[in-house]
Amino acid sequence: MRKLTKMSAMLLASGLILTGCGGNKGLEEKKENKQLTYTTVKDIGDMNPHVYGGSMSAESMIYEPLVRNTKDGIKPLLAKKWDVSEDGKTYTFHLRDDVKFHDGTPFDADAVKKNIDAVQENKKLHSWLKISTLIDNVKVKDKYTVELNLKEAYQPALAELAMPRPYVFVSPKDFKNGTTKDGVKKFDGTGPFKLGEHKKDESADFNKNDQYWGEKSKLNKVQAKVMPAGETAFLSMKKGETNFAFTDDRGTDSLDKDSLKQLKDTGDYQVKRSQPMNTKMLVVNSGKKDNAVSDKTVRQAIGHMVNRDKIAKEILDGQEKPATQLFAKNVTDINFDMPTRKYDLKKAESLLDEAGWKKGKDSDVRQKDGKNLEMAMYYDKGSSSQKEQAEYLQAEFKKMGIKLNINGETSDKIAERRTSGDYDLMFNQTWGLLYDPQSTIAAFKEKNGYESATSGIENKDKIYNSIDDAFKIQNGKERSDAYKNILKQIDDEGIFIPISHGSMTVVAPKDLEKVSFTQSQYELPFNEMQYK
């Protein structure tokens, strides 16, 4: 039994937990005030959307892009329509003429140019996003028409402009010295909520924007409340101090499967899950020259040591489906099957022997040239499911004669390691439905992505060039075939081991309607939600 379950049982026995019989005063007050208060393990951070210090779920309430990516493709948002030149290098956007920033400043072509130029001033920071390297210039054609010129054709351009950041819009009056790369004075966007009171590491209020250009929010306020994951978040939801939780963009799941079930069983809450949004994976660092993971045969062996079916069923409680390939088939251009290695310990053992790592008579750990087969794995300590998976894999690796040292760190530290290459193995995830496949594939060769992980591939330059070429292809079938070829080579290298197809989980009051999802695991349409 989990620690949380034991804690809950003791509190229930002592009568300290409120029961779900309609007597939860905290929930009733929030409904009356048309308010949601969600639990989060981290402060919302810096709400400047042109850098990466803030919570994307919070930023998406404040800021908006030119276009929206939906299950039916790219749709208008701040741009009511657009034209693309025959050579695919010029995008002309025709803007809405009824939009204002939260500070009253009109949203127009000049504001669009200033914002995109501001993002481009810091383009090294955005190199993981291919379009940032291709924007040549932005021209104002008239008050509500703007022209975006690329250095070369790039088919995913609109999809990348539709992302929650960085190509979203801040009031030019908030710029510092005419730009945003060194911060902004305030956080005025065009979205359905305005940032209200923000108490660092405690809470942040997002108040309804009564002057919003689109359909106004049915909620008066959404509040983010900072607290530890686990018992604290669970009890807060039980008492009605908070009444909403979701798998956030920092990789954390504040509530584990036991607490989700208990909250639902009270009758006060509903639990909803999205379609597959991304792929949870194990990244094996081919560039770690001082470790056995630099050996392709060892990486392939590790691929046969991951029992994704057992992980999905027993650790993830069936909430996520086993991932047999890096991208699910609901991802754009991924209309093919490419099964990765199956769980097979005998095959793993054979590959380790082939790589020269032998089991000795006096040790359970394999050795080669007098050196033990030892690896370090990193997981997000804010994710209880990652911790459980790490512990499970530690036991599996031990069976194979590998000493696996597991380390829990913050999501920020994990991201730093991904960039620096200071890891043997780590848990990570694909960029997500809104971004993929282009963003994760582009990240295979980017410093801020997985360049360190792929740097040990013998023919990496050839693969990197294939990636650049694929992004120029306008024909859908040809582009899909190009992606398939790239992914086949990457899978053969054993660097990205898919585990499960992750979805977004929401816990909401039972009487909250229109709880839905977008194409992104990084945002929720709070403005559409309403109480019965």
UniProtKB/Swiss-Prot annotation:
Query: What does the similarity note say?
Result: Belongs to the bacterial solute-binding protein 5 family.
Q: Which organism is it from?
A: Staphylococcus aureus (strain NCTC 8325 / PS 47)
User: Any phenotype upon disruption?
Assistant: Deletion of the cntABCDF genes decreases nickel and cobalt intracellular levels and decreases virulence. Insertion mutant shows attenuated growth in several infection models.
Any one Gene Ontology cellular component term annotated for this protein: outer membrane-bounded periplasmic space
Residues that bind staphylopine: R165, R418, N448
The UniProt-reported impact of Y435A is: Strong decrease in StP/metal binding. Slightly reduces metal accumulation
Q: Signal peptide location in the record? A: 1-20
Residue intervals passing through the bilayer: none
Question: What is this protein's record name?
Answer: Metal-staphylopine-binding protein CntA
Per the record, membrane topology reads: Lipid-anchor
